[in-house]
Structures are given as C-alpha cells and as structure tokens.
Design a protein with these regions (language model features):
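C-terminal transmembrane helical hairpin of 12-TM major facilitator-type secondary transporters
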Residues: 66-114
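Intracellular helix-loop hinge segments at the cytoplasmic ends of transmembrane helices
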Residues: 22, 113-121
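Helix-to-loop junctions at the C-terminal end of transmembrane segments
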Residues: 53-67, 153-154
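A late C-terminal transmembrane helix in Major Facilitator Superfamily
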Residues: 122-158
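Extracytoplasmic gate region of multi-pass secondary transporters
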Residues: 1-52, 145-146
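Multi-pass alpha-helical transporter architecture, strongest
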Residues: 86-89, 115, 158, 165-194
Length: 194
C-alpha cells in the first residue's frame, strides 16, 4: 500500500506544483488583487521551503505509531484540505493563498512516511526492487498529475473559469483519497485474514 500511496501522493504533489503559479495569477485577476510575478514566485518558493518541515514532521510523527494507519489518516486529511482549498477560491485572494500554503503542507506531510514505509515493510533482500518500484509508481503519478489538471481546466471553461479551478483542485485531492482508500482496503483485507 505504501507504493500505491506514493503514486497518489506524487500525482497530487506534481499536479499542484505544475499549476500553482497560473492558479495564483487567476486568483489575483479574479479578485482584482495586484501582485507581481516576484511575489508569486517567492510565495511558491516559500511553500516549497515550508514543505520540507512538513515532510520531516510527518515522518517524525509516525515513529512508534502504526505508520500505515497514520499515513491513511494523513491522506484523508489532505483530501479534505483539497476540498477546503477549492472552496476558498470562491471567497478571497488572501484566504485562497493561505489555503494553498496549508494544502501544500498537507500534500507533503506524508512524503517521508510513505518512503519509509516502503523501506521497512519488507525483507532486506528485495529492498532495492521495492524502492525501484516505489520510484517508478511515484514518477508515473507525478507524470499524470499536471496533465489531469490541464484536462479539467480545458474541459470546464479554461484558466479563467472559476469552476474549472475549483474542479481541478478537487481532482488533485483524488491522489490523497486513492492513497487513503488503498490503505483502508489493506486494513480490511488484513482483518479478514486474521
């Protein structure tokens, strides 16, 4: 489940990173808030920097706990975060920008924990293969995320459509939902076997 969860995680992460700049431009135009390209770039840079600490915190939080359960809960929390972020687009530029920061942190929260879960849940003799598969599934998810957002934007009104941005961020959240549901499925399957 950690490998499939990582695919959902990178789908969401790379989709978010691909489209955050144009999203902030849309929001500033929609709410008539004048911001420079430098402000947007610095905001995105700060999101990335703060994301490092979110990932470290998430990995540290899992120590001594049921990692799979915690990561599943993080996925559900991130899915809710995507919904709240999408809703914030209807209210104000500054609220939406704040929610983009929060959502970014929620996306990255489980990053280290997913990789650690892949490493520790298996035998030492197949660790290299598991990590290779982990990376391949992760990059596949990452390759799909950006185009999915673009597809949603193109088919629901374009980059100037409020509805299109709302739906695109809901679609981003599906990465975390798939991750969380993958873990829930494995929990259910494990309980049936015992």
């Amino acid at each position: 489940p950690f490998i499939l969860g990582y695919g959902g995680h990178t789908y969401e992460l790379f989709g978010f990173r691909s489209w955050t700049f144009p999203c902030i431009i849309f929001l500033s135009n929609h709410f008539n808030v004048s911001v420079s390209d430098a402000f947007i770039a610095n905001s995105i840079g700060l999101m990335g920097f703060l994301g490092i600490f979110a990932s470290i915190y998430g990995a540290k939080y899992c120590i001594g706990k049921n990692r799979a359960q915690v990561v599943s809960n993080m996925g559900m929390l991130c899915f809710v975060g995507s919904i709240l972020t999408a809703i914030s687009f209807w209210f104000s530029f500054w609220l939406a920008l704040l929610m983009l920061f929060v959502y970014n942190a929620l996306i990255i929260l489980d990053s280290g924990s997913l990789t650690t879960g892949t490493v520790v849940n298996g035998d030492a003799h197949d660790r290299g293969v598991r990590l290779a598969l982990h990376s391949m599934v992760g990059f596949l998810g990452g390759a799909i995320g950006g185009p999915v957002v673009g597809f949603v934007l193109d088919n629901f009104g374009g980059q100037t459509s409020h509805l299109a941005w709302f739906l695109s961020f809901l679609c981003l959240g599906l990465g975390s939902l798939v991750s969380a549901l993958t873990f829930k499925y494995y929990f259910f399957k494990y309980k049936q076997q015992n």
